[in-house]
């Protein structure tokens, strides 16, 4: 292992000189010993500048570094621990436990930079993945082994949907999940860990946390850590996939990955591109997204929260992410303002597998009919605002009445939000969702006021609440 010296420190970017015959390769991890009582600082090589000098980005704070300090080339990229022993643990970008529970009981490690599966290794089966959330399962169904993006501005409920899905999958499907906290609030990460530890899996003494690996590089971390933490989490998920498992990867928030890349790019002296983003935006996103895929041995199903700056979907960061997704779930502020949660816009959300050959004729028919009715209601809203509902034709009055019921029926109580709403969470199977919406469309519940459809699980809950109100 070659040893060099620090030449220059600019924020989190470090220039180091090495012997000509020991120049570190791009993406190699460099180690800077910090002396007594402090763990070493790890940097990642980003550029070879010539004259045996490399430029690297630090994975933690550069406080206390001075020129002339020793830098050791580890000869390999950053590696993280993998295997079942990582379940129920919390890690940082370097794979070091940050939960105070001691060392991880595994010696297996994998580098965070790996090639994506080849065409021959990839699987192209299209299969619906049940989430238990009505609006998602009906309108924008997940693809098993696919990528879904949850788009929304600040405070419309992206993180809550992710928390509910982790909980549902652990309880209903006994699956493993990997959670990457990329540049989000540490408080939310802390809340998530405690909620998962309190959430028991029915019929066992295990909690949801015991089936989840958590990797954090939060807002207070340097941009290098926020840029690489998604790769660390993905590497842990890839191990489970190669062992033949179907694993879930949650990334909250993929926009912060792009944002960190932009910061690193500026520090490395690259010319900024559109709206100040890095010129390598598409390449960086592609390198991450192409690794999130299904192979013939197992699958990684991914859900990514995507912050939309100023609710502008044409911003390069969300626009670049769109290209990689199989399904998009769009959260609208106008829906959350009505108090309807999850605030999913059924007209703006899409899925590649909403196809009669995959989800079945009945599911496809009900989903498209629901969208048609909601679109008609949206078209009529201008007329209603000017003239009032009474001026509509009888057919349009019926459409408006049913559309308002559908809109409220898309709301659903979440288990993870029970402490705020005091309503127990509901998991609704896909079959029940399709049947319930088909019955509402058919007019079977035209006699029930729309308020009874709000915050219910299946249609039986609506009927039960209505019957109870008459007694």
Curated annotation (Swiss-Prot):
EC number(s) reported in the record: 7.1.2.2
The keyword Nucleotide-binding appears for this protein: yes
Subcellular location, principal: membrane
Gene Ontology CC: plasma membrane; proton-transporting ATP synthase complex
Catalytic activity, as annotated: ATP + H2O + 4 H(+)(in) = ADP + phosphate + 5 H(+)(out)
List of residues binding ATP: 152-159
Disulfide-linked positions: none
Assembly and interaction partners: F-type ATPases have 2 components, CF(1) - the catalytic core - and CF(0) - the membrane proton channel. CF(1) has five subunits: alpha(3), beta(3), gamma(1), delta(1), epsilon(1). CF(0) has three main subunits: a(1), b(2) and c(9-12). The alpha and beta chains form an alternating ring which encloses part of the gamma chain. CF(1) is attached to CF(0) by a central stalk formed by the gamma and epsilon chains, while a peripheral stalk is formed by the delta and b chains.
Class of this enzyme: translocase
Name of the encoding gene: atpD
PROSITE patterns: ATPASE_ALPHA_BETA
Protein name per Swiss-Prot or TrEMBL: ATP synthase subunit beta
Keywords of the record: ATP synthesis, ATP-binding, Cell membrane, CF(1), Hydrogen ion transport, Ion transport, Membrane, Nucleotide-binding, Translocase, Transport
Reported function: Produces ATP from ADP in the presence of a proton gradient across the membrane. The catalytic sites are hosted primarily by the beta subunits.
